[in-house]
Each structure stands twice: as C-alpha cells, then as structure tokens.
C-alpha cells in the first residue's frame, strides 16, 4: 500500500513537472553605436560579434534589448539567424532612434500580436514625456509556444536617465497597459529602468500586484555584481538598474547577471574589454 501511494505521488510530481512550461528570457542594453566609444576602443564593430556570440550561446527564448540603432539591429539579425524581432525606432515610430527591440526564437515561439507605446502623455505618438531628456518607448509582444500552446506577454522598455517625473509616470503607464493588454495572461517585463532596486519606480512595479523582481524570487541566483559597468571591468556595485520582472504565474528557477569580458587585440598587445556598458541579465522561468 505504501509503495503504491509513493509511486502515485512520484507520477503526479513527474506529470506536473512535465506540464510546466520552461522559458528562458533576458534583458540586455547593448549600448548604442557611437564614435566616442570607437575612439576609446569600445566600438560596435568589435563588440558586435561578442555580443551576438554571447546571445547565441545563452540562446534565450525571448530577449529584451535596449539602445539598438537600426544598423545594429541589422547586424544582430545577420549573426543571430534563429531570431526575429519586434520594435520600432523611438524617434519616429519607424527606423529613427533607438529601438527597445524584442528578439524571439522564431522556431520556438509564434508571435500572436505586438505593439508599442511611448512613455509620455501621448503614448500613441513619438514625444518627450513629462521631464524626460529623451523620447522613450516600450515594446510588447504576445507569444505562444508552438509545442505547449501556452501564451504569455513580453514587455520591454528603456526609461529616461534624467526625468524623475517621466520615470514615475512612465511606470504607472506601463502598469496600466499591462492590465489592459495582458489581463490574466502571464507577463514578463524587461528593461533598463535607469534606477535601481532602492528607487520609487522599482517600488511602483513591485507593489502593483502584477509583477515580482526575478532577482528577489529566484530559487538559484548568480549575481556577483550590479548591472551597469560603464565599460569598467573592475567596477563593483550592488546597484541593479536592468531588471527582469514577472507575474506571479511564473516560478523563477534561476537568475544570473553575466559579467563576461573579452580580449581585444593579439598577444601581449591584447586588452580586456566588456561587450557593453551594461551586463546582461538572464532568467530561467517555468509556469
């Protein structure tokens, strides 16, 4: 009798595990292409193969990216053939300015719907929001797993680096849009918030009842540093301004901030460099 009961429990647990949807997601501010970085030895031409190799190796199912210019987007798609993307340039809703692009594995996931809105008083058109220094945008997609047929929403944003009011009101707007678009469907939110875990904006998200910080709820965590490095490999901080948040429907299995470096140059002339001025965050989820 005891053996029969034990066998039943094992079968139930196995079935529950088999039914759980595994999802690997991430957030990566890849740093926009500019001449100053190139002059300082951190040009996109040398960083791009490293950034893309890192993404290809991790192979997330969905990745929220920030600061992607259109030329960089084309470079990444060429080196990441398993992926497609959604997103528009923030300056005109087409190709101008930075994208908050969402890359997704097109073999694994089917894109059901997508859109974007600006973090401003006029969310449907490009505009500076409140006291922001730059135009800011949020991209979203509705995805369905081709095998399990489970559905989820993915939101990705880049908040302003200057505007305190813009970040606060932008956070409220994102929460409102998540409620409207996703309803009770599981949600992932990624992005460069430009503020850390001690900020008002972080609290707006984590006390909304909709989202939880994956860092705080991970069963297993590898995070030896914060997420902004300013191209300084020896910089140590506890500040996390790049976040991955999920609805309570998700179990956060593993969370990692990956602090990889690479060598630029040959032999004794090589120097250690970082792929971006932000470290990527990757998270294993199940739901």
Where are these regions (language model features)?
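Structured beta-strand-rich core segments of catalytic domains in phosphoester-bond hydrolases
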Residues: 62-153, 256-258
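Bacterial Sec-dependent N-terminal signal peptides
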Residues: 1-22
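Metal-dependent phosphoester-hydrolase catalytic domains
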Residues: 165, 169, 176-187, 195-287
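Active-site-proximal beta-strand elements of phosphoester/diester hydrolases
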Residues: 22-37, 100, 112-117, 150-160, ...
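Active-site neighborhood of phospho(di)ester-bond hydrolases with catalytic His/Asp-centered motifs
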Residues: 64-66, 88, 188-192, 213-216
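N-terminal, active-site-proximal structural segment of metallo-dependent hydrolase catalytic domains
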Residues: 18-79, 90-98, 172, 287
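Catalytic metal-binding/acid-base residues of hydrolase active sites
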Residues: 31, 69, 158-160, 193-196, ...
């Amino acid at each position: 009798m005891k053996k029969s009961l034990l066998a039943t429990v094992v079968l139930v647990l196995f079935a529950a595990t088999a039914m759980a949807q595994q999802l690997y997601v991430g957030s990566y501010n890849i740093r926009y292409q500019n001449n100053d970085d190139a002059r300082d030895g951190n040009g996109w031409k040398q960083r791009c193969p490293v950034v893309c190799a890192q993404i290809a190796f991790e192979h997330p199912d969905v990745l929220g990216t920030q600061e992607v210019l259109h030329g960089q987007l084309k470079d990444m798609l060429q080196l990441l053939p398993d992926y497609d993307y959604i997103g528009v340039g923030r300056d005109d809703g087409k190709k101008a300015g930075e994208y908050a692009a969402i890359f997704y594995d097109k073999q694994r996931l089917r894109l059901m719907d997508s859109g974007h809105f600006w973090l401003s008083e006029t969310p449907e058109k490009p505009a500076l929001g409140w006291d922001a220094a730059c135009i800011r945008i949020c991209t979203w997609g509705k995805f369905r797993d081709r095998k399990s047929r489970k559905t989820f929403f993915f939101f990705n944003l880049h908040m302003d680096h200057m505007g305190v009011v813009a970040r606060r009101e932008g956070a409220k707007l994102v929460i409102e849009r998540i409620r409207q678009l996703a309803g009770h469907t599981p949600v992932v939110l990624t992005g460069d918030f430009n503020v850390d875990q001690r900020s008002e904006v972080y609290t707006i998200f984590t006390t909304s009842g909709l989202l939880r910080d994956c860092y705080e709820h991970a069963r297993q965590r590898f995070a030896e540093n914060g997420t902004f490095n300013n191209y300084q490999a020896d910089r140590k901080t506890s500040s996390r301004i790049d976040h991955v948040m999920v609805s309570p429907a998700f179990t956060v299995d593993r969370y990692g901030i990956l602090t990889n470096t690479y060598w630029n140059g040959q032999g004794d002339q090589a120097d250690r460099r970082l792929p971006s001025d932000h470290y990527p965050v990757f998270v294993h989820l199940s739901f």
